[in-house]
């Protein structure tokens, strides 16, 4: 772990600031976690930090499609935090059952360690948001999860099938995984369905 510089700032709670800096420096590692999907231009794989930023932006852009009662500020914060656990747990490919089977355990252990780097009040707050996102029971969490599921679909369509083609994914597999989108946003769910239909016509799915 990278430790903060050994300097002292006057008029600041040094222990608290050190904990915050330690967390901030640790999350720099998110930039080196590569996801399976490519950038929309197909030039290289996306990393987790880019993914998290793009989803936070999407929450603002698509705010009008959020369910009633959703708090977009909370959704944005959720999306900034949601993949921090992958610093320890790594990226889990959505169409790899063997990876999925251990995902929850790996990510909970990562959340225990990483969020605990923060001062206690911030640790409780960030962990509660992450748990809420994972549980998907609130309008905020459902909308956040919908955006998280839509983004790789867009990347795959714009890279001529992307991971769908590379890993031999079927239409049925994609349709099952993206049901979550409609749960969080009727409009985005409708768009996702139309995108699947078009991707199918273009031959982006395995027939196996």
Can you name each region flagged by the protein language model?
Residues 1-208:
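Alpha-helical, largely C-terminal catalytic domains
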């Amino acid at each position: 772990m990278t430790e903060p510089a050994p300097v002292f700032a006057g008029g600041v709670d040094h222990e608290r600031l050190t904990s915050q800096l330690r967390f901030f420096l640790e999350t720099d590692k998110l930039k080196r976690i590569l996801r399976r999907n490519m950038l929309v231009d197909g030039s290289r794989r996306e990393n987790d930090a880019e993914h998290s930023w793009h989803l936070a932006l999407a929450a603002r852009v698509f705010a009008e499609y959020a369910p009633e009662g959703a708090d977009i500020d909370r959704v944005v914060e959720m999306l900034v935090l949601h993949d921090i656990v992958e610093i320890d747990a790594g990226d889990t490919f959505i169409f790899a059952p063997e990876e999925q089977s251990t995902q929850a355990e790996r990510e909970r252990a990562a959340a225990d360690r990483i969020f605990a780097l923060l001062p206690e009040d911030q640790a409780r707050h960030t962990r509660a948001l992450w748990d809420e996102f994972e549980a998907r029971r609130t309008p905020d969490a459902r909308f956040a999860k919908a955006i998280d599921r839509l983004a790789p679909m867009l990347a795959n369509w714009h890279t001529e099938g992307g991971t769908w083609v590379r890993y031999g994914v079927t239409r049925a597999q994609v349709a099952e995984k993206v049901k979550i989108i409609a749960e969080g946003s009727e409009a985005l769910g409708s768009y996702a369905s139309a995108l699947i239909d078009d991707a199918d016509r273009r031959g982006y799915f395995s027939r196996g």
